[in-house]
Amino acid sequence: MELKRMQFTGSVWRPPYEANSLLLQATIGCSHHRCKFCSLYKDTQFRVASREEVERNLEIAQLYQPKARRVFLTGANPFVLSFEKLKILATLIKIYLPEVQNIGCFARISDIKQKTIEQLMELRQLGYDRISIGTESGDNITLSQMNKGYSVMDIVEQCRKLENAGIEYNFTYLIGLAGKGQGERNAINTADTFSLLHPYIINVLSLTVFPDTVLYEEIGMGTFIEASEYERIEEMEMFIERFQPSNCVHLLANTVSNPIPFIGALPKERERILKEIQSIKNNFREEDLRDYRKRIKSL
């Protein structure tokens, strides 16, 4: 009997915490595609998976994972899909996989902006929850320099819409993104921005620049200077000290971009995490951490 495989176009990315979710292709590539540091979808033109593609994959998923409880839609930002298309996706998922409880995906702040609070509430009822937002920073200068396409005010306004709709969300924080000498500003402003909101997870990555990015070209021209590994650690330390969540937030710094991985819950484990960071500063040399980053070939 021939093994049937679900079809995906190009590279597939998902957060570490979605490891147990069923992956389903909803979009291909990125609708924004202008962030200076990113080349994940460089050679992939953005498009929406057709209904036929989605149903073909769901038929296969039904064979091998009929009791799946969570689906993670792949693509850089499937939440860019219209309200109606997201409704259709959720309906199809329920038809083929009736035990699915919730649906996650990557999202841009601009994707949320397109939807009304009433539409978001209906999407929550259909199962959309714990969407992962590539905020990267809560500092306006950094967001602008990296062509993120939105401001701190946009982050706060749109995430409050999610909260009012009952949709939980996760953030990405990319340390080192502000460049050399700017880590303190980025840490303080990002902590202050995130403190206004209620993310479930903050997924911490450390900037890793690859040759096929605009940022790599700027480094070559001298218009962007990378933060040292120690400055990045200090940025993370300042963020943790300043961040004041009103709910339990899971801090995950355990991707390949983090030379010394750690995880913890804030505010409960703040002191333990800070002690771990101090231990990293005491026991690892800048050159060793830098050598590790140079060996990273992909994320």
Predicted regions and their residues:
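Canonical Radical SAM [4Fe-4S] cluster-binding loop centered on the CxxxCxxC motif
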Residues: 10-53
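Catalytic cores of alpha/beta
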Residues: 118-120, 179-196
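Conserved, mostly hydrophobic/aromatic
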Residues: 30, 38, 54, 73, ...
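Aromatic/hydrophobic pocket-lining residues that form the small-molecule binding cavity
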Residues: 54, 86, 116, 155, ...
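Conserved strand-turn element in the central/C-terminal portion of the radical SAM core barrel
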Residues: 110, 138-142, 162-186, 205-211, ...
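Short beta-strand segments at enzyme active-site cores
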Residues: 68-74, 132, 169-174, 202-207, ...
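Auxiliary Fe-S-binding modules of radical SAM enzymes
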Residues: 1-18, 195-299
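Conserved SAM/AdoMet-binding glycine-rich loop
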Residues: 62-168, 245
